[in-house]
Amino acid sequence: MDSIGDNVTEMDAFVRDLTMKPYAELEKRKAELHAQKLKLVQKRQQLLRDNYNVLVDYARNQDAFYQLLENSRHDFKELVLHTNQLYEPVKRSQNFLTSISEHYRDAKLMHQVQPQLSSILELPELMNACIERNYFSETLEFQALAYRLKDRFGTNSIIQELITQVETLVVKLTEKLILQLQKPLKLYSLIKVVTYLRVTAKLSEAQLKYVFLYFSWKQLQTSLRNLVPLLDYNNPELYLRRYIQVIRDRAFSLLFQYQSVFGESSNDRLNAAGTVDIPNSTSTSASPFEMDPEGFNNFGQNILSSFVRKLQLEICYVLQKFMPNVKDSTSKFSLLLQLYYCNQSLTKVGTDISIPLSKILGSEWLEMIHSQSSEKQA
């Protein structure tokens, strides 16, 4: 009985070994076994030829054979008496045969779906290639496919490893999308990038707004710093003219993009433009968006107004510092007119800085507004 159990264990190990090997290796093993079979047949035939005399002697000793047969019958009766003892090994053998059948069915199924399995295992590589080439929509399709596999086969170790690789790539995708926000983008591209971030990034809507406005502010500051070589403290007219133009173009563009992407106007958050304090020389050194961790939720409710207030402080600081140095009345009038049109553009996106400007420019700004209003009425 111990021998039978050992044989069953060896057979079970042999079958498990077969099921773990690739199909091509099984074919090779099959060919080797077939060759061994042929050798055994030839060996058996040779043995028959070599033992011919023994067989003849066996035929001449039929009495001994019949006696042996009688002994075999006796042994058979003994075997019948021990049937109950043999039941469990037989049952194990039957279960073993059932297991072989199941393994064969699984192996056959694996062979049939091998091309599909190969494609699934290549998913992280394809996803990474799409990220490297900025094919973001295709990357999200691969991500969705991976998560569908997770929903259906979440307990499978191969799928779990696949999902781990995909989630690592999603982090890489998110980082690359955030890097895209650091570049000047057209509205269509910007909407797509923010939409992708809503899917991939574990960020709230307020955090997305913060990231967008943070990089928008950095882009605006970069454009303004590029104007520094034009600055002449004794005659800053050229610098102010270019400065106002940059504010008009870039600030209008980024606020318009913000409204288009997030569906929120600065009018929704601002109480009145007049609530902005007159800036001083220390205002530009502060962080554009100061907040503490506990106040982040409250900050998310008025993030755009914080950005607009910072923009107002920036404009008012520069005008307060350099506008008095413009002595020529014609040049000053031209700058005020340009500033008026700049404010008109910003007003279209919900940012009116008339009141803060009136506090630092006084009657000159009020006269400009009055004269332009009179011209429109005329």
Curated annotation (Swiss-Prot):
GO BP, one annotated term: intracellular protein transport
GO cellular component: Golgi membrane; Golgi transport complex
Subcellular location: Golgi apparatus membrane
Topology in the lipid bilayer: Peripheral membrane protein
InterPro entries in the cross-refs: COG8, Cullin_repeat-like_dom_sf
Disulfide-bonded cysteines: none
Entry keyword set: Golgi apparatus, Membrane, Protein transport, Transport
One Pfam family linked to the record: Dor1
Subunit structure, as described in the record: Component of the conserved oligomeric Golgi complex which is composed of eight different subunits and is required for normal Golgi morphology and localization.
Function in brief: Required for normal Golgi function.
Family: Belongs to the COG8 family.
UniProt protein name: Conserved oligomeric Golgi complex subunit 8
Taxonomic path: Eukaryota, Fungi, Dikarya, Ascomycota, Taphrinomycotina
